[in-house]
Amino acid sequence: MAKNFLIELGTEELPPTALRSLAEAFASNFEAELKAADLAHQGVKWYATPRRLALKVAELAESQADKVVEKRGPAVSAAFDADGNPTKAAQGWARGNGITVEQAERLKTDKGEWLLHKEEVKGKPVQELVVDFAAKALAGLPIPKAMRWGNSDIQFIRPVKTLTILLGDELIEGSILGVSSARTLRGHRFMGESEFTIDSADQYPAILEERGKVMADYDARKAIILADSEKAAAAVGGKADLEDDLVEEVTSLVEWPVVLTAKFEEEFLKVPSEALVYTMKGDQKYFPVYDENKKLLPNFIFVSNIESKEPRHVIEGNEKVVRPRLADAEFFFNTDRKRPLIDRLPELEQAIFQKQLGTIKDKTDRITELAGYIAEQIGADVEKSQRAGLLAKCDLMTSMVFEFTDTQGVMGMHYATHDGEDEQVALALYEQYMPRFAGDDLPSTDISASVAMADKLDTLVGIFGIGQAPKGSDPFALRRAALGVLRIIVEKEYNLDLVDLVAKAQSLFGDKLSNANVATDVIDFMLGRFRAWYQDEGFSVDIIQAVLARRPTKPADFDKRVKAVSHFRELDAAESLAAANKRVGNILAKFDGELAQEIDLALLQEDAEKALAEKVEILAEALEPVFAAGNYQEALSRLAELREPVDAFFDNVMVMADDEALKTNRLTLLNKLRNLFLDIADISLLQK
C-alpha cells in the first residue's frame, strides 16, 4: 500500500536569493534517488520558507518490488574441461553466487551457451532507504559556502534545528546533519504556535498554516504577493514594479506574506526616480509604484512577515525607515549638481581601473579616442561621441554614485542634462552600459553605441593584454562585454570588423600590454561568445561550427552566414553536398602537390567531370557579385544546384587517376568546387 511521505528540515534563516534553487535541487536529487531505487510514487513537491526545506512525495510505495537478477557466468566451453568436470573459473563463479556448478542454469545465445544464475532479490522496505536518500539529496545541493556550528564538524548552508521524516503516520527514525528525526515542527517566529507535533504526512502543509502561521508553499506565497501587490498599486492609481528577481527574494524572506502600501513625501520626486528606486528596491526590498505614464508615484508596496492588529504602525515604521535614505538621495543630488560633471574629470586620476592598466582617467582617454574612431566608421557624430566618452565615467566621482553604486550612468545622464550638455551626449552616459544583461535593450543612438562599444572593447583588450583572460570567474565581466559588442554590431547591422576594432583599441594602450597575442586572443574569445549566443537562439552547434571554421571577423557578416547555413540545411541537397564536401576535403588533405588556380578544360575527359566543371565555372562567375553583397542565402541556394553533377562525378570519375595531369586537374576542379562553399562556411561539418 502506498503512503504519502514527508521530510522537513528546519534551519536558521536560509539565504533568500538561493532558496528556490536549494529547494528545487533537493526535490530533483531526492526524486533521482527514488528512480534509481525503482520506488514508485505519484510525484514530488517541494516546500521552502526562510526556515525550512521540505519535500512531500505522493503515494510512495512502501517497498521496492521483488525482482530476479540474472548473473551470467563463464561460457559453457570454458566452464568444463575435456572430461566434463567444472573448471576453477566455473567453481569460483558458482561459489561467489552461493550455489554449486550443478545448480546453475544455461543461457543460450547466438554467440554461444553460458552458465546462468537467477537470484531472487527481495525489495527493501522504504523505511530502510529514505534517510540515506535524503542525506544524499542534501549533500548534492548547490551550496557555494557551507558553515559549521557548535562544536560539530558537520557543514551545511545554515545550522539545522529540526528534522521530521514521516511515512504516512509512521515516524521514520534516523539522523541527518546531526539532528534526529522527530514529529516536532516549528511555526512562525511571532505568530501561531512556536512548536507543535505532526501526526501524519497527510497533514502537511495544512497543519503549518493552521497552527504555525507558516505558508510552506513557495509558489502560493509568491502568487499572493503578486496578486495583492497589483491590487494595492491599483488602489493608489498606479502599477507596481514587480521585477521577478525581487519578488522571488521577497517570497524567500517571509513565511506569512501580508502586502501593505506606504507613502513618502512628494518633494522627493524631484530627485531622479532611478536613485529613489535604487534605495527602495535594493536596500529595503520595496516595490515602487508608477502611474500610467511610467512616472514614479510617492507610494511603495512592501511585504510584511506578520499579520498585525495595527497595520498602520507597521506602515509608519517602514515609512520611517525609508525616509532618511530618500533624504540622503535628495541631498546628494542637490550637492552634486553644484559642480559641472566635466569638473570631475581630473578626479578620475585618483581612481584605479586596474593596477597595470592605469586609472579611470587613462581609461576615459582611451574610450574618448576609440569612441571617435568607431563613430567615424558607422557615420555617427564624432565630436559628440568623443564628448560623451570624455564624460562617461565622471559620475563615478559624485556622492550619489558613491553611495548608490547602481545609479552610475543614469546619474551621469541627469547631471549632464542639468549642465546643458547635448541631449544625445547625455543619453550616451546612461546607455554606455547597455546591454547590461542577456536580452537587455541596446543603445538607442549611434553615439551611445560608439561609447558603449569603446568602453567594452577597452576592457576586453586591456584585461586580455595583461594575461587575465576569464577562466572560472569573470571579475571584469568580459563575457558580457564581448556579447554586448557583438549584439550591438549585429542587431544594428554595423559594417565593423573585429580585427580593426581590436587593433585600434590595442594601439591606445601604448606599452602597457604584455600579451603579444592579445588581438588573436580577444577575437577568438569574442567568436566563442557567438557560439553561446546562437545556441541560445536555437541554432545547432554544427551550423555555428561550420561558420566559425571560416573565422569571419565581421559580426554582422557572421550573422548572415549562420542564417544562410541554417536555411541551406533544410534543402534536399544539403545532406548530399555536406557529405561530398567532407569527401573532397579528405581527398585534398592527402595531396602533397600544388594545384593550379584554374581548371584545364582540355584535360577533361569524362562527361561527368565536364558537366561539373561547366557548372562550377558558371556558378563561380554568377556568384561573385552575390558573395560581394553578402547574400549568402541566395549563394547557398544556387550552390545546391551542384548536387546532381557532384553525385554523378563521384559515381563515374576516378579522381586519383594514374595520369598525373588528369589527377591534378580533377583535384583542381574539386578544390574550386569546395572553395565556392568555403567562401561562406565549411558545410562538411554539418551533421545529419
Curated annotation (Swiss-Prot):
Predominant location of this chain? cytoplasm
SUPFAM superfamilies xref list:
HD-domain/PDEase-like
Q: Which Pfam families match?
A: DALR_1 (PF05746), tRNA_synt_2f (PF02092)
Superkingdom assignment: Bacteria
Keywords, in A-Z order: Aminoacyl-tRNA synthetase, ATP-binding, Cytoplasm, Ligase, Nucleotide-binding, Protein biosynthesis
Among its keywords, does the record have Cytoplasm? yes
EC code: 6.1.1.14
Matching InterPro entries, A to Z? DALR_anticod-bd, Gly-tRNA-synth_bsu, Gly-tRNA-synth_heterodimer
**One GO MF term attached to the UniProt entry:** arginine-tRNA ligase activity
**Which reaction is recorded as catalysed by this protein?**
tRNA(Gly) + glycine + ATP = glycyl-tRNA(Gly) + AMP + diphosphate
According to its UniProt entry, the protein's GO biological process terms are: arginyl-tRNA aminoacylation; glycyl-tRNA aminoacylation
> Where's it found, cell-wise?
Cytoplasm
Q: Which GO terms describe its cellular component?
A: cytosol
Spell out the subunit comment. Answer: Tetramer of two alpha and two beta subunits.
Of which family is this protein a member? Belongs to the class-II aminoacyl-tRNA synthetase family.
Q: What is this protein called?
A: Glycine--tRNA ligase beta subunit
Q: State the species of origin.
A: Aliivibrio fischeri (strain MJ11) (Vibrio fischeri)
